[in-house]
Amino acid sequence: MFNRICMYSASLLLLALSATAHSDDLAVNTMNPYDMVEAVAKNTFTRFHQDIDIINTDPDHLKLIVSDELMPYIDYKYASYKVMGIHLKSTTKDQRERFVKAFQGYLVSTYAQAFTEYTDQQVRFPPGKDFSGEKMVDVNVDLIEPGRPAIKLMFKVRRLKDGSWKAFDLVAEGVSLLASKSSEISNLIRQKGIDSVILELEQRNKGNISNKTNGAKL
């Protein structure tokens, strides 16, 4: 059940980002959370279209695109710690570092696979709000497909100590990707221990990206 939610949310993320893509790279203003989301969107999908011939031959190239264009703006360390939840305090420094790396790889694989679900969509970004003094901001997005109700997305971003912003969660139709994963991971750590969970994530990350016949034309 969770994997379906996760892939659905990741697919919606990339579909929403795709609708803002244009032809030229845009400088990413990490000091403005609203500008950041749109700029990262544009650059990620510009790279996607530029590398489509490579992707057709090697779908795993999508992992490189996600790593280069998307992940620098994802606070995967913060997300990893949130996912570990109450188990964080009982882990060693080495375990935390290994888990963060494994969870980062999991996100890369998840978003790379979501690219294969890409179809042309329309997206609406409501005007940004005043974020001065805020530590966390919700960037709302409406994903629009003809003949269907708009899908409500929310990118949750947080301000870092240097004043820049990074995203750490996606909420799709009220379902938090981070909260869903936290529930699953917490249960697995309790049952198997953190080391086993790390190994399981690492093993998942070794899987290849598979093309989808009903999504992107790769």
Question: Which positions does each model-derived feature cover?
Answer:
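Solvent-exposed loop/turn segments at secondary-structure junctions
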Residues: 88, 105-106, 130, 145, ...
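Short beta-strand edge/turn micro-motifs at domain boundaries
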Residues: 152-179
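Low-complexity, intrinsically disordered terminal/linker segments enriched in charged
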Residues: 172-218
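N-terminal signal peptide c-region/cleavage motif recognized by signal peptidases
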Residues: 16-18
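Bacterial N-terminal signal peptides that target proteins for export
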Residues: 1-9
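Surface-exposed, charged secondary-structure patches
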Residues: 109-151, 204-218
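Early exported N-terminus immediately downstream of N-terminal targeting peptides
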Residues: 26-111
